[in-house]
Amino acid sequence: MKKILIGGIRLYQKYISRFTPATCRFYPTCSAYGIEAIQTHGALKGSYLAIRRISKCHPFHKGGLDFVPPKKDKNADSEHSCKAHHHH
């Protein structure tokens, strides 16, 4: 699913975006953000983050730097909770 979504974004970048004026209010661009979000967080959460970002890309939003949030390390959380419940 990730490959299909990223492929769709790449098609947009290659065949649509390059022929339109640069209007994205953010860095990285919304399409680059979408690819990174899907690569980092997977198809479902990455798509959610991309849609949320695109919904902010309008003339009434100031834009600016907006990077994909890092993926939370699930092992660190489970390791911590495991240590907290382990009796010596």
Swiss-Prot record:
What family is reported? Answer: Belongs to the UPF0161 family.
Give the residue spans that cross the bilayer. none
**UniProt xrefs under NCBIfam families:** membrane protein insertion efficiency factor YidD (TIGR00278)
Organism source for this protein? Listeria monocytogenes serotype 4a (strain HCC23)
What is the stated purpose of this protein? Could be involved in insertion of integral membrane proteins into the membrane.
This protein's superkingdom? Answer: Bacteria
Protein name as it appears in the record: Putative membrane protein insertion efficiency factor
Which residue stretches belong to region Disordered?
66-88
